[in-house]
Amino acid sequence: MSTVAELANAVVSNADQKDLLRLSWGVLSVDMEGTGLMLMANLFKTSSAARTKFARLGDVSAGKDNSKLRGHSITLMYALQNFIDALDNVDRLKCVVEKFAVNHINRQISADEFGEIVGPLRQTLKARMGSYFDEDTVSAWASLVAVVQAAL
């Protein structure tokens, strides 16, 4: 099993992946709140376990009308922005990932459970990127998710 530092280094060292992450982030971040809500809705559609883990948010089907869900969605997107901003520095990426992981460890989210976000992220990327969507972009994001998984 790879360590956080090893996986962070693999992402930081891969210029092609970093380009794909930054390009797709440019699209995703145009509407931070909307994209975050879409990502969470896609997660809840694909995972009943996720709905259970997020019970504290209340009625997630209310979408934008649920202030707790909105808050989580916005916070999630700014965490992703921190990851993107740290793509050129292994130590910085490791630090922001480990801080992000603490929140999930405290809520008893396992690495495998966290990895379930890749499918909903793929759906979100496809919806947001349209004809610019490709599987290489999903793979780049999956590599970033793997860094978080290693920290859990």
From Swiss-Prot:
Entry keywords, A to Z: Acetylation, Heme, Iron, Metal-binding, Oxygen transport, Transport
Residue ranges annotated for the Globin domain, each copy included: 12-152
InterPro entries: Globin (IPR000971), Globin-like_OT (IPR050532), Globin-like_sf (IPR009050), Globin/Proto (IPR012292), Mb-like_M (IPR044399)
Pfam families: Globin
UniProt xrefs under CDD domains: Mb-like
Protein residues bound to heme b: 72, 104
Molecular function GO labels: heme binding; metal ion binding; oxygen binding; oxygen carrier activity
In-chain residues carrying the UniProt-annotated modification N-acetylserine: 2
Sequence similarity: Belongs to the globin family.
Subunit structure: Heterotetramer of two alpha chains and two beta chains.
Protein name, per record: Globin-1 subunit beta
Annotated source species: Anadara trapezia (Sydney cockle)
